[in-house]
Amino acid sequence: VPNKYTNDYQGVEIKNGTNYTLTDDILNYEGLEINQSDVMIFHTHTCESYTPTENFAYEESGTFRTTDLDYSVVRVGNSLTDQLTSYGFNVVHDKTYHDYPAYSGSYGRSMATVENLLISHPNTDIIIDLHRDAIADTSYAPSIKIGDEVVSQLMFVIGTDGGGLEHPNWQKNLQFAVKVQKKANELYPGLFRPILLRNSRYNQQLGKAACIIEVGATGNTLEQLSLIHI
């Protein structure tokens, strides 16, 4: 993965970790047609957690991991669900453990969850796998000041078929991320880190606007995360 962004499209920076050349035709989202009313949120790594604080102390089930959903990335999913619902979106937030008790096979289990959810919500295009970024430096806390508050930065991770698995939707997924990030740049410059484009598909073949969103990293705290408005 490149250390810095390799592409800039209308102010949206992208780290291209694939062999694809990102042309304007690939990145242009003007023709993107998706159902914008319904949103699905789930967590492949449900137990991912943040740096504990006095106000947010929790029992770890592993390093920066907890099965207590009040202190894991699921809490961030709850906040995002509340925000999107207040804006009029229909949101399904699944809180199934996919990485506990076994971490290996998480993506296979979360794929089964999403496939089952799509049976009852077949028209959902926006499918968000909400994560906490895993960085070797556990003190790393990507953040930015918005107004008087310090908040955690966000990052889209978009998969492709570069790893050899079928993934006809990856360009649509990327266009969706570019569209959202361009708008976010106008409202909250710097809230998003560069989009990360990878060879793995991360179950994103299941939607026309499917993505991973990394919310902060291990060094961030829930105090910072609670201030995010998307």
Task: Enumerate the language-model features and the residues they cover.
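Conserved small/polar residues in nucleotide/adenosyl-binding loops
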Residues: 229-230
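Active-site-proximal helix/loop segments of hydrolytic enzymes
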Residues: 107-122, 126, 132-221
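N-terminal catalytic or cofactor-binding beta/alpha core of small enzyme domains
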Residues: 1-123, 135-139
